[in-house]
Regions:
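Soluble "head" domains of membrane/secretory-pathway proteins
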Residues: 2-22, 37, 41-47, 52-245
Length: 245
């Protein structure tokens, strides 16, 4: 009797079973929906194509961005549904570039709403005090513009300017080679996508070769990986898992 009851729980001869393609199709569909939800509300991956954030972030770094650091947002309009926090000075953030919404930028938050920002001979002053910018690097001794020269550039001397409400002043750590708020202004709060928090992969390819965002999952990236010699292709193992500060 026990054996009969146990067998009765199994599939009966001739019972209907889902086709192979349907089972895998449903699994792929569920995985796709979960990926969309994670990308829209939780975490999104980005790659670093330029050196404006060196040495904190290098070309070829792949990082994850916490998308709910500053609130749960409408994935279509990027408007905050549920506020959870505000950007803090020193945060490394990804945002929609105000001058071209098709581009995402990554910089460090320097000025908060209401702050008075002034740059004097490369040194950042916030509300009249010299800011602590240990992460910043400079490699060009020339001042642009000179202290008493024409103001056709704002790289090394700027302001003072006051950060508007609901906006932020951002800069790259590679100060002499970063296109940031010194040149195009402030970042509205609605443009923020999230806070960068970890490097999950990092590699260095041949000089002047493009960095493919699809490297980890795309066939083109794999072909490049196996076609390059070991001296041209380098995985930066010491950067994988590094927390972004």
């Amino acid at each position: 009797m026990i054996a009969m009851n146990y067998r009765s729980l199994g599939a009966r001869p001739g019972s209907l079973k889902k086709p192979f393609w349907r089972e895998y199709g449903e699994a792929l569909f569920i995985a796709f929906i979960l990926a969309l939800v994670i990308r829209a509300f939780l975490v999104q991956a980005f790659s670093i194509p330029s050196g404006s954030m060196q040495p904190t972030l290098l070309i070829g770094d792949y990082l994850l961005v916490n998308k709910f650091s500053y609130g749960v947002r409408n994935p279509l309009t990027n408007k905050v549904w549920i506020p959870l926090g505000m950007p803090q000075r020193g945060d490394v953030v990804v945002f929609i570039f105000p001058q071209d919404p098709s581009k995402d930028y990554i910089k460090r938050v320097i000025g908060l709403p209401g702050d008075r920002i002034q740059i004097i001979n490369k040194q950042v002053h916030i509300n009249g005090k010299l800011a602590k910018t240990a992460e910043a690097v400079y490699d060009d001794p020339v001042l642009i513009p000179p202290p008493q020269g024409p103001t056709d550039s704002t790289r090394d001397n700027l302001g003072p300017v006051v950060v508007p409400a609901d906006s932020y002043f951002v800069m790259g750590d590679n100060r002499d080679h970063s296109y940031d708020s010194r040149f195009w202004g402030f970042v509205p709060m609605d443009n923020f996508l999230g806070k960068a928090f970890i490097i999950y992969f990092s590699w260095q390819g041949p000089p002047n070769e493009p960095i493919y965002a699809a490297f980890l999952g795309g066939l083109k990236g794999l072909l490049y990986q196996f076609s390059w010699s070991s001296k041209d292709f380098l995985i930066r193992w010491n950067r994988i898992g590094r927390i972004i500060q």
